[in-house]
Amino acid sequence: MNRFIMANSQQCLGCHACEIACVMAHNDEQHVLSQHHFHPRITVIKHQQQRSAVTCHHCEDAPCARSCPNGAISHVDDSIQVNQQKCIGCKSCVVACPFGTMQIVLTPVAAGKVKATAHKCDLCAGRENGPACVENCPADALQLVTDVALSGMAKSRRLRTARQEHQPWHASTAAQEMPVMSKVEQMQATPARGEPDKLAIEARKTGFDEIYLPFRADQAQREASRCLKCGEHSVCEWTCPLHNHIPQWIELVKAGNIDAAVELSHQTNTLPEITGRVCPQDRLCEGACTIRDEHGAVTIGNIERYISDQALAKGWRPDLSHVTKVDKRVAIIGAGPAGLACADVLTRNGVGVTVYDRHPEIGGLLTFGIPSFKLDKSLLARRREIFSAMGIHFELNCEVGKDVSLDSLLEQYDAVFVGVGTYRSMKAGLPNEDAPGVYDALPFLIANTKQVMGLEELPEEPFINTAGLNVVVLGGGDTAMDCVRTALRHGASNVTCAYRRDEANMPGSKKEVKNAREEGANFEFNVQPVALELNEQGHVCGIRFLRTRLGEPDAQGRRRPVPVEGSEFVMPADAVIMAFGFNPHGMPWLESHGVTVDKWGRIIADVESQYRYQTTNPKIFAGGDAVRGADLVVTAMAEGRHAAQGIIDWLGVKSVKSH
């Protein structure tokens, strides 16, 4: 009889641990580098309250094997296996499989060419501990069924039938025999999500202190106790771009072991006290949490913040006494999240690092783009002290291409990493968008942060005082919310956020929208700006809008806004802030050294190249927003860490694996 994996739907949590274990088992027990390679051979199905996992049944008279015209699918060692060399990707097996468990996977084999092959459960053939999905299911909902196991199952059921154990009078006895709660019962008994406390609303409206108060110990314990620990490598870990060991450090919080938790946190994350505050967890780890739909996700971000804040306040610092210095030096251009992450990993591998940045403090947009009410700037100052103690050297107020040349860096250092972010505001091409009273989001936020920090403003980034003004912010992302909430704190008489789609389709965090509303912001949805209106002095006085409805989805699956004919109106405004996103700024000093950029100005570098994130100049690596375009802090850090590994491999340094 062929062996197969059987799922117990009554025990299944729907946690996806089996999928992640499957993919890692076929990738040397490592996470794949991108979502494009995430092809589990087992699939979790959720429908209403039903949850189960589906995979190949290894049929005795397998339709996939019978349908294969090239003999690529056959019986091997009590299972049905695919011979990848024989497979021609004809899809006959996909059509023939009655359970829908066959896939065709495309694998790059040469420039512009791919090989299509059939993909199915192989029972982890050759794996010492057997099928990874069975080993890693936290609810024991999966088992490998053999002929012996099947016979034993049938015998057990016959005995239960003979004893009439399914009759009502046996129910109380059965309950007494099962004192240990199953994972499903634990999930059903999970208390509701607990949110962190906030500053009083009046204090929020007039000040720039962080609005979220840190978790108390009892709050952290309560939230940690809600985690089901869905497998060794859980879905929250996979959906985090850094692949943080989330359930493991939550377990350590439950045990009261903050020192071990912070060490584990720093194995994958350079700035956990930052990501705990500014990550959009609702779109990443918390959005994937197994208990999200029933009880609300575990507040992972607040636990992460709690771990770091507690440990750093107690004086925890990274121990690099075991690191052996190597005779290699790397220059990093940009002290933002990508650059700092790259510097961190290189330093932990003994490489000498100098970071160059044009700003007076490290952090890039963490420091100067994100307002203080979301991220206390003292955190970055403390982190600079930590990095400096680790041996990282900083050259601040130093702009590459102006104060120091790339030529000199290439001459002095063994490699260069470029993590400069994106600073050029996207324009909408509206009439009069360069008129007085119209501001780009980033210079507005940078000048505000410098004013709060007591730093000197620059002529090209003057402080904009919105006190008493009627302000309209165009855009629907987190940057737009930052502008809205900043203008309110400076005493604007009225602040409106205008967005061309509906609220459900806003790209920004729901949490940020909620906070903006609480602080007094107004929202105008389904409106598209067509022109900026000027008064007799040439100053902006309003915005001409068209109302919109949602049409067909675009390439990203978001429904396009379609203007409604005859719906034009003018919204009065004393100041307009345009928050449409960012593009990479020009870097002629980089392109002149053979570094290729795409038509949008993004540096061409890939995590899947021979050396991760190596550019077309082999001595120069790049990552973060300069490569992918404006994105999240956590994705920039992930790319900086990957690039550091690429540099280590290219330099021939013996790598110290962090996880």
UniProtKB/Swiss-Prot annotation:
PROSITE patterns, alphabetized: 4FE4S_FER_1, 4FE4S_FER_2
Cofactor: [4Fe-4S] cluster
Protein origin, superkingdom: Bacteria
Residues in 4Fe-4S ferredoxin-type domain copies: 3-22, 47-77, 78-107, 114-147, 218-252
Binding site for [4Fe-4S] cluster 2: C22, C121, C124, C133
Annotated residues for binding of [4Fe-4S] cluster 3: C56, C59, C64, C97
Binding site for [4Fe-4S] cluster 1: C12, C15, C18, C137
Induction comment from the UniProt entry of this chain: Induced under anaerobic and microaerobic conditions. This control is mediated by Fnr, NarX, NarQ and NarL. Expression is not reduced by the addition of respiratory electron acceptors, including nitrate, under anaerobic conditions.
Alphabetical keyword list: 4Fe-4S, Iron, Iron-sulfur, Metal-binding, Oxidoreductase, Repeat
Cofactor notes: Binds 5 [4Fe-4S] clusters.
Keyword field contains Iron: yes
An annotated Gene Ontology molecular function: metal ion binding
Binding site for [4Fe-4S] cluster 5: C227, C230, C236, C240
Biological process (GO), any one: urate catabolic process
Disruption phenotype: Under aerobic and anaerobic conditions, the disruption mutant is able to grow utilizing ammonium, L-alanine, L-arginine, L-glutamic acid, glycine, or DL-serine as the sole nitrogen source.
Coiled-coil region(s): none
Residues reported in the UniProt entry to bind [4Fe-4S] cluster 4: C68, C87, C90, C93
Role description: Involved in formate-dependent uric acid degradation under microaerobic and anaerobic conditions. May reduce the enzymes necessary for uric acid degradation.
Domain writeup: Contains an N-terminal 4Fe-4S dicluster domain and a C-terminal pyridine nucleotide-disulfide oxidoreductase domain.
Matching PANTHER family: GLUTAMATE SYNTHASE [NADPH] SMALL CHAIN, OXIDOREDUCTASE AEGA-RELATED
Protein name (Swiss-Prot/TrEMBL): Putative oxidoreductase AegA
